[in-house]
Design a protein with these regions (language model features):
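Sec-dependent N-terminal signal peptides of Gram-positive bacterial secreted proteins and lipoproteins
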Residues: 4-27
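PPIase-associated folding chaperone regions across multiple families
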Residues: 18, 26-29, 34-35, 131-183, ...
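Solvent-exposed, polar/charged alpha-helical surfaces in well-ordered, non-transmembrane soluble domains
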Residues: 42, 46-49, 81, 85, ...
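Surface-exposed patches in mature extracellular/periplasmic domains of secreted proteins
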Residues: 103-108, 202-206, 241-244
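Peptidyl-prolyl cis-trans isomerase
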Residues: 191-229, 257, 261-263
Length: 331
């Protein structure tokens, strides 16, 4: 199995986990509170700078003047808190790697170590003087974080090793149709009969009789519309449906594309990602509830994101993917 084939898979899954794991405040959960070695400030700042600069590239530096959804927390504090949670997840995955992966010591081979060193050197050589001042990291710090990140990636693929990644066309099919929507069944039946006439123009009938301003629809297998109108998936290109009743409305469809290949492939990847994300979130939630890692180092309260234009680096993951994104396999 290829490790980390989806180049942003780990980042995506960790964001999902950070977003969906419930707070344990006020809830008694049997667990083992792990006393582990926390990341140093310099090690953490590698990830802080990455996310800070990605936000500023997308939203501009004024983003830090805003507040989060509750209207009270500065967005700056909110993002720093999420980086902390993110790294707590990475540390939890590393704990799993060291305690649960059989022969884990053989995973990080001399070849892997050599590649990670290349990644670390390329990253630190890419940093500007401003980046170095803000992050204040050494080559050893970077090497440590890339090694931890590698192990976290490995655990994700290990957890998903038995997942079936094959999604059939029938599960992900996307079609396109034109529609006519009417409230009167008899009139709808008459329109359907008229559409059978040679040369009948569906667009003309839609303009004349449809009560909906929407004529063209995209219907994805598994979405709300596919549940309402499963008959639409039985149509061939150019074929008309019978009159379909739903919620006191009467629908006539004409299939314009019985298999939208591009959208179907996109849908397939979306479903695959959702299945893998759900499977890993379940795996992680069970393990993390029994092995709670919470960073307590006070430096997290001191980190600032605003007023640091000197740092621009955003290539931590890009460099990792350059070396490992398509190549590694589970041992």
């Amino acid at each position: 199995m290829e490790l980390f084939k989806n180049k942003k898979l780990l980042l995506f899954i960790l964001i999902v986990i950070v977003g969906v794991l419930p707070s344990c405040s006020g809830i008694k959960i049997p667990n083992v509170n792990r006393n582990i070695e926390e990341y140093t400030k310099s090690e953490s700042m590698i990830f802080v700078s990455q996310l800070k600069n990605e936000y500023e590239e997308t939203f501009g530096s004024d983003i830090w003047k805003l507040t989060s959804g509750d209207g009270k927390t500065k967005y700056e504090s909110y993002v720093v808190s999420n980086v902390k949670k993110y790294l707590e997840v990475v540390k939890t995955l590393n704990l799993y790697f060291s305690t649960e992966i059989e022969n884990s010591s053989k995973v990080i081979t001399s070849s892997v170590n050599s590649q990670i060193m290349k990644v670390a050197r390329e990253y630190i050589d890419s940093l500007s003087d401003g980046d170095k001042k803000y992050i204040n990291c050494t080559l050893e710090d970077v090497l440590k974080m890339y090694t931890e990140y590698y192990k976290a990636c490995y655990v994700i693929e290990y957890a998903l090793r038995n997942e079936d990644n094959e999604i059939s066309v029938s599960e992900s099919k996307v079609i396109r149709v034109d529609q006519i929507v009417m409230s009167d069944k008899e009139k709808a039946t008459k329109v359907r009969e008229d559409l059978n006439q040679r040369g009948a123009n569906f667009a003309y009938f839609a303009r004349q009789y449809s009560e909906s301003d929407v004529v063209s629809l995209k219907i994805e297998r598994g979405d709300e519309l596919s549940g309402m109108f499963p008959e639409a998936f039985l149509l061939d290109n150019g074929e008309l449906s019978d009159v379909i009743e739903f919620n006191n409305k009467y629908y006539i469809f004409r299939c314009t594309d019985a298999y939208d290949q591009y959208e179907t492939e996109r849908r397939k990847e979306y479903i695959k990602k959702a299945i893998r994300s759900k499977a890993f979130t379940d795996f992680y939630s069970e393990y993390a509830s029994q092995n709670v890692i919470v960073f307590k180092n006070p430096y997290w309260q001191e980190i600032t994101l605003s007023n640091h234009p000197e740092t621009k680096t955003t290539n931590f993951f890009e460099i990792f993917n350059k070396y490992f994104g398509e190549e590694l396999k589970l041992q």
